[in-house]
Amino acid sequence: MENIRNFCIIAHIDHGKSTLADRLLEFTSTVSNRQMQAQVLDDMDLERERGITIKSHAIQMNYIYEGQKYVLNLIDTPGHVDFSYEVSRSIAACEGALLIVDAAQGIEAQTISNLYLALENDLEIIPVLNKIDLPGAMPEEVKDQVVELLGCDRDSIIPASGKEGIGIFEILAAIIQRIPPPKGDPKAPLQALIFDSQFNSFRGIEVMFRIFNGTIKKGDKVKFINIGKEYYADEIGVLKLQQEPQLEMSAGNVGYIISGIKEAKDVKVGDTITHVSRPGEPIQGFADVKPMVFAGIYPVETSEFEDLRAAMEKLQLNDASLVWEPETSIALGFGFRCGFLGMLHMEIVQERLEREFDMTVITTVPSVQFKAYLTKGNEMVVVNAPSDMPEPTTLDYIEEPYIKAQIITKADFVGPVISLCMDKRGIITNQTYLTSDRVELTFELPLAEIVFDFFDKLKTISKGYASLDYELIGFRESNVIKLDIMLNGEKVDALSAIVHRDKAYDWGKRLCEKLKDLIPMQMFEIAVQAAIGQKIIARETVKAMRKNVLAKCYGGDISRKRKLLEKQKKGKKRMRQVGNVEIPQAAFMAILKLDQ
């Protein structure tokens, strides 16, 4: 156990975590030259395409340092704010962390929030200055920022470059010297923390764990404490690039267990594995993840509902932060109400459903969770979808979630950033200059305002320099209302949205204009209306396709023409009473891009 080191890599997006991990694997000969490719650990196509890490990945390296053999367990973590839950799970399984800071970008919001996560868990932090080979690198200034943030020694910051392979040896030496070996007693009752799982269609569910106390042998009968189910450890082993089976593993190690589990709901991340014969106490796991954004996901063909359910269950194994429950919509039939961590997470889930499971899905307007208080008996209703909103007459008041957002940006862009946040109903609470050129702004904002396109806009106005991190600070009373969209007098529940009263008219008008362009012409005219309760606030008309019934009248009497036109009008009216309007997927997506 003395020679085991468990560590993870934390950094902001694009500061070079995955590239540095590649170099460490190459340097310790964990990966042969033949297997080497960029972002070795990012095994989803989606991750490679977007160049981001979505899942945490664990891998074991062997390294000989000063004549002794060490086992290093590396857990690579995502950097995006939507996936901070993945990071917190990885941190719980480690004793140390490499904090990577880009020498050209400096410290960003995500760096700080992940660092606080690591410090709360008493991890040993090794600061690494990455990308020092870039022409725009400012190693001395960034070192000052790191010293100020961590209060560490200037010399303890390791200059490195993942691309050029500079400083890799120093990093490995620091991991061995500075990170403490895992504590734990191999003879105590077994306690192993589950930090990830994935589905293998041949072998059932593979569970990744970190042993805190005790020893597990192949063939042992184990129990998952939270769920209370018992299994046999058919295969246990360590995670190299491929899995390597072992006969026994003891405290301090990170590995996987396969026991033919078929049911997705039997494995919960954060659960504890122990022996049936000699049970240990459950480990205090992580806080349950709280979804921030809710949206409906529906199959395009109603017959595919069961396939979609199976796909969602398999996806949940690998993505512990996805929450869902079945729901029905008048317009779209059966589907699921899903909770996501943010908009990027929602996009990724939708893309993974399409790629990995061949499901074409329709997503409805994303919304956040509101609390509606009724006038009768002080009752509280949780509103996750616009259709859950009680009638306006029964409402006393509504509360919406607020967040504290920390934005770090260059001094030149402070003005535009502040005005963007003011537009989004934000209040500025603090402004500090980290260096002469970098400012940290703290805002309190309604979560609903940043769900849509806040992040994109922030990047646009700051030329890509601003970085954002946010946390929930609770619910506050707010003047929000439900806006309905009606087509020919029928409400389309999937297009409803909950918006702030001040923005309702503008939103309704723009949405009607957008839908008018997107809904294909029918044989009858379609009235597109936006309504609050019974009051119509905007209307557009999609004109009908019509035949020129006067084509056969050359000259002729006006009354003859009028007769033909009246006849056509009656026919169109009859069609409108029985006709259904098909809403294209583009119409649902349009709502997300109303501002552009």
UniProtKB/Swiss-Prot annotation:
> Which stretch is the leader sequence?
none
- Domain of life of the native organism: Bacteria
User: Per the UniProt entry, what are the Gene Ontology biological process annotations, in alphabetical order?
Assistant: positive regulation of translation
Note the InterPro entries from the entry. Answer: EF-4, EFG_III/V, EFG_V-like, EFTu-like_2, LepA_C_sf, LepA_CTD, LepA_IV, P-loop_NTPase
A Gene Ontology term for the protein's cellular component: plasma membrane
**Where found?**
Cell inner membrane
Molecular function GO terms recorded: GTP binding; GTPase activity; ribosome binding; translation elongation factor activity
Q: Give any Pfam family that matches.
A: EFG_C
Top EC category: hydrolase
Query: Where in the numbering of this chain does the tr-type G domain appear?
Result: 2-183
Q: Quickly give the catalysed reaction.
A: GTP + H2O = GDP + phosphate + H(+)
Q: Which CDD domains match?
A: EF4_II, EF4_III, LepA, lepA_C
Q: How does it sit in the membrane?
A: Peripheral membrane protein
Q: Keyword annotations for this protein?
A: Cell inner membrane, Cell membrane, GTP-binding, Hydrolase, Membrane, Nucleotide-binding, Protein biosynthesis
- What is the annotated role of this protein in its UniProt record? Required for accurate and efficient protein synthesis under certain stress conditions. May act as a fidelity factor of the translation reaction, by catalyzing a one-codon backward translocation of tRNAs on improperly translocated ribosomes. Back-translocation proceeds from a post-translocation (POST) complex to a pre-translocation (PRE) complex, thus giving elongation factor G a second chance to translocate the tRNAs correctly. Binds to ribosomes in a GTP-dependent manner.
PANTHER family (alphabetical) = TRANSLATION FACTOR GUF1 HOMOLOG, CHLOROPLASTIC, TRANSLATION FACTOR GUF1-RELATED
In which family does this protein belong, per the annotation? Belongs to the TRAFAC class translation factor GTPase superfamily. Classic translation factor GTPase family. LepA subfamily.
Q: What is this protein called?
A: Elongation factor 4
Gene (UniProt):
lepA
